[in-house]
Every structure is written in structure tokens, then in C-alpha cells.
Amino acid sequence: IERCTPRILRLAPRFTPWQAPPDMDELTQIQAYTQLWTIKEALYKIADQPSVRFYEDLQIPHFQALAPCQQALITCPEGDKAYEVQSFFWEGYIWSMVGEE
């Protein structure tokens, strides 16, 4: 569970290649990047491998900001694993849950 704060805008380039569209307002950007963070955090926990790289190996290839369902991947030498992600939004907080496809 993660609280939506403007700090995420400074951190985003460290954990995702995704960039908000130029016409997206700041509040929506904060929510979108927080959602990405919670998705990657959930993927990292399910991967349970210290060698997994947060930026490179935890991917949301077709991320749609604030969509409640997303597809995600964990890439690794043994083969990629696909996951379905559900995100939940409540009063300035976001959390995401990952399940295998």
C-alpha cells in the first residue's frame, strides 16, 4: 500500500522508463507513477530472487495509467513469466496485487 505524494515524480526515472503524456495533470501523474511503483513492488516480492533488477526485469509493457487491470512480466535468464495485476485506489492510496496468468 502506497500513499500518493509528489515525491514519486522525482523517483520515477529511477524505476520506470514510462513517461506520462505531456497533457496529463500533476495529480494524475502522481497517481500513475505510484501505481507503477506498487506494481513493481508486488512483482519484486513475487519474484523472490535477489538478482531481479527493479528497473530492467520488472516490466509493465503496455501500462495504462490508472487502469485497474494490467499485464506484467518478470524477465530472467530462465524465461519470462507473465502476470496479471490488479490495482486498487482509495482516498490517496494505491496498492497492487499480482497473480500468475
Please identify what each model-predicted range represents:
Residues 2-101:
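Core catalytic alpha/beta fold that binds nucleotide/phospho-ligands
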